[in-house]
Swiss-Prot record:
Belongs to the peptidase T1A family. It comes from Arabidopsis thaliana. The gene is PAE2. InterPro entries: Ntn_hydrolases_N, Proteasome_alpha, Proteasome_alpha-type, Proteasome_alpha_type_5, Proteasome_asu_N, Proteasome_sua/b. One of its GO terms (cellular component) is proteasome core complex, alpha-subunit complex. One of its GO terms (biological process) is proteasome-mediated ubiquitin-dependent protein catabolic process. It is found in: Cytoplasm; Nucleus. There is a cross-link at residues 43, 66, 185 (Glycyl lysine isopeptide (Lys-Gly) (interchain with G-Cter in ubiquitin)). This is Proteasome subunit alpha type-5-B.
Length: 237
């Protein structure tokens, strides 16, 4: 007996006759509604810049977390459902600490990304696994390890790619084309900050301020910029 399109729509583990997983495709589309995040890799380190959508003047801007630390040498920016991102980040944090405890060394950025994507591919852990959906979030993972700086991009299918520069979220199409024009492998970390924030300024629908933009760098340690440091970057535009 053939399943209807609606039944294929609901199932996360059932391929349609065309070889598609509709729930995963819908999750990827959901990310295009999220806030824009940009990552740029340089020889010195990696810069992450993210748009923070402050939906009400009553909202405390510092409570909107769009960039999170995974380990002291890895951070990630997100676009999509923040609760889903938090689940993935918590999983990655446990993996990196277990690795450090077991082997006495930090986990590589690629291995951390792989562990995170393994969970994304299972759509959850333990009891959650049977009643789950794809994670509706995409991540830019920035890190610095024995191989130098690296930037990875993940999507809800559990796939990841290594990038020199990448944008995700609602403004990703325009931001990606701007990155292609402005990026080169010899830029400095300071130039990468300026490029990332200037492109965010182009795609955002409001004025760029320390309240609606988060910036972080991994060079080689993770550092989330203070509002004063963000203001200093904005003043260079």
């Amino acid at each position: 007996m053939f399943l209807t399109r609606t039944e294929y729509d609901r199932g996360v583990n059932t391929f349609s006759p065309e070889g598609r997983l509709f729930q995963v495709e819908y999750a990827i589309e959901a990310i295009k509604l999220g806030s824009t995040a940009i990552g740029v890799k340089t020889k010195e380190g990696v810069v992450l810049a993210v748009e923070k959508r402050i939906t009400s003047p009553l909202l405390e801007p510092s409570s909107v977390e769009k960039i999170m630390e995974i380990d002291d040498h890895i951070g990630c920016a997100m676009s999509g459902l923040i609760a889903d991102a938090r689940t993935l980040v918590e999983h990655a944090r446990v993996e990196t600490q277990n690795h450090r405890f077991s082997y006495g060394e930090p986990m590589t950025v690629e291995s951390t990304t792989q562990a995170l994507c393994d969970l994304a591919l299972r759509f959850g852990e333990g009891e959650e696994e049977s009643m789950s959906r794809p994670f509706g979030v995409s991540l830019l993972i920035a890190g610095h390890d024995e191989n130098g700086p690296s930037l990875y991009y993940t999507d809800p299918s559990g796939t990841f790619w290594q990038c020199n520069a990448k944008a995700i979220g609602s403004g990703s199409e325009g931001a990606d084309s701007s990155l292609q024009e402005q990026f080169n492998k010899d830029i400095t970390l300071q130039e990468a900050e300026t490029i990332a924030v200037s492109i965010l300024k182009q795609v955002m629908e409001e004025k760029v301020t320390p309240n609606n933009v988060d910036i972080a760098k991994v060079a080689p340690a993770y550092h989330l910029y203070t509002p004063q440091e963000v203001e200093a970057v904005i003043s260079r535009l």
